[in-house]
């Protein structure tokens, strides 16, 4: 949502080599209310609770039913990515190139520069992610940087300095470029790095296409009628990141968890992060005419769009926010269970980023739910403390 002034650099600094990114649904399971029932099983057939606010406000809701259309659509992608990873692991080896060596472009030294620049961009825009990649193997680290840069550039299309010029056609062109790079025909050096990454790791193109789809939504959609609609949006712009990065970060060889369950946890982390982003930015978004909150849940809480634009913290608002925060925390909890199944070097950065983001929810509470005019943030001391604590926890999990 926010844009960055140095973003233009992502578009201009790159020399052109040719000369010129279920249902976890967290099973959104009211475990605090359904004591004595089976623990959460990721990807079961139980329907996620679409309105966690209900969990706060009302009696237990029976949630066992079929997946919604949004959940089905997302679940398909999870299954597809999990299958790709399993196939790569069992048949070809996770490090084998996707297409025949002779078809691949020989980027030679350029590729080294391309990855290096991706690292610089990641370091500049996302210091914590960057720091987190330092323990990974060089191959994995470079690959996460390349994915990061592609995601950042995609977001900058609709949120950056040139966003007013972005049309659905421009996003179609960006998607064509994505297809090209997946087929070994990168357009610029950042694309070349990602092209190399997807040739080495079993990364499916669908989450990348879906992130572009999320950006398409941002071009015309500024209201979400239900959590189901919002869930799909969060999957598009953030859940996808989990599906893109786990094939690179790797699942622990001794993990007994199913590939699919680890992917569901990764998806949960993206959703949790985006729900947190949304709750933090309610005021900022409303000033841009946007409301990324489920309108039906707002109405159930006795709140209207006008209440959001007015931006007054009332008891109704506090109650509504408590429900939204609870839901985001459930997604974080779901994600946290998956961390232990990642390759050991990847656990620390993921846990650290999870804790840092989750603390934003604590900050919203500390601000007495005033997310209209106060920006919730995690102070530097807390940030710094999270890193060694996450490191110690991740080490214990190995
Ligand atoms: C098993 C398990 C738990 C695995 C973990 C899997 C994993 C690493 C998941 C990553 C989840 C994650 C970091 C999601 C990103 C969510 C996010 C911040 C999305 C942002 C979307 C739109 O935001 P908006 O415009 O509303 O807000 P801004 O004001 O613009 O911030 C994004 C901006 C989309 C673009 C996403 C990125 C640029 C971040 C991509 C990050 C990576 C590829 C690095 C992940 C690596 C590590 C080490 C955690
Ligand atoms: Mn953005």
UniProtKB/Swiss-Prot annotation:
UniProt-recorded name of the protein: Phytoene synthase 2, chloroplastic
Lineage, highest ranks first: Eukaryota, Viridiplantae, Streptophyta, Embryophyta, Tracheophyta
Keywords (A to Z) from UniProt: Carotenoid biosynthesis, Chloroplast, Isoprene biosynthesis, Membrane, Plastid, Transferase, Transit peptide
Membrane-topology annotation of the record: Peripheral membrane protein
Organism, as annotated: Oryza sativa subsp. japonica (Rice)
Reaction equation(s) it catalyzes: 2 (2E,6E,10E)-geranylgeranyl diphosphate = 15-cis-phytoene + 2 diphosphate
Name of encoding gene: PSY2
SUPFAM superfamilies reported for this sequence: Terpenoid synthases
Record's note on what induces expression: Induced by salt stress and abscisic acid (ABA) in roots.
Span of chain positions assigned to the transit peptide in the UniProt entry: 1-80
């Amino acid at each position: 949502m926010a844009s960055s002034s140095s973003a233009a650099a992502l578009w201009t600094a790159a020399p052109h080599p040719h000369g010129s990114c279920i249902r976890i649904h967290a099973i959104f399971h009211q475990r605090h209310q359904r004591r004595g029932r089976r623990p959460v099983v990721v990807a079961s057939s139980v329907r996620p609770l679409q309105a966690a606010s209900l969990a706060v406000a009302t009696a237990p809701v029976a949630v066992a039913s079929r997946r919604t259309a949004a959940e089905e659509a997302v679940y398909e992608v999870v299954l597809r990515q999990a299958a790709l990873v399993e196939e790569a692991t069992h048949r070809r080896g996770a490090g084998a190139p996707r297409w025949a060596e002779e078809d691949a472009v020989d980027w030679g030294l350029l590729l080294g520069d391309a990855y290096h620049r991706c690292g610089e961009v990641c370091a500049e825009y996302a210091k914590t992610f960057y720091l987190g990649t330092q323990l990974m193997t060089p191959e994995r680290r470079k690959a996460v940087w390349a994915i990061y840069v592609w995601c950042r550039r995609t977001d900058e299309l609709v949120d950056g300095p040139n966003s007013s010029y972005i049309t659905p056609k421009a996003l179609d062109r960006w998607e064509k470029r994505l297809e090209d790079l997946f087929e070994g025909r990168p357009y610029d050096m950042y694309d070349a790095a990602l092209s190399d990454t997807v040739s080495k790791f079993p990364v499916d193109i669908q989450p990348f296409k879906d992130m572009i789809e999320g950006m398409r939504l941002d071009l015309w959609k500024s209201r979400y009628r239900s959590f189901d609609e919002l869930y799909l949006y969060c999957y598009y712009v953030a859940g996808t990141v989990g599906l893109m990065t786990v094939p690179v970060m790797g699942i622990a060889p001794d993990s007994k968890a199913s590939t699919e369950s680890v992917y569901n946890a990764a998806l949960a982390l993206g959703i949790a992060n985006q729900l947190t982003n949304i709750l933090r930015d309610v005021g900022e978004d409303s000033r841009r005419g946007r409301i990324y909150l489920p309108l039906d849940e707002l109405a159930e809480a006795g709140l209207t769009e006008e209440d959001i634009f007015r931006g007054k913290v009332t008891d109704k608002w506090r109650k509504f926010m408590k429900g939204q925060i609870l839901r985001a925390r459930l997604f974080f909890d779901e994600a946290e269970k998956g961390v232990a199944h990642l390759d050991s070097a990847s656990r620390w950065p993921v846990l650290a980023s999870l804790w840092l983001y989750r603390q934003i929810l604590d900050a919203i509470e500390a601000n007495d739910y005033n997310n209209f005019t106060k920006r919730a943030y995690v102070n530097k001391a807390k940030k710094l403390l999270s890193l060694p604590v996450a490191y110690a926890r991740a080490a214990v999990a190995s």
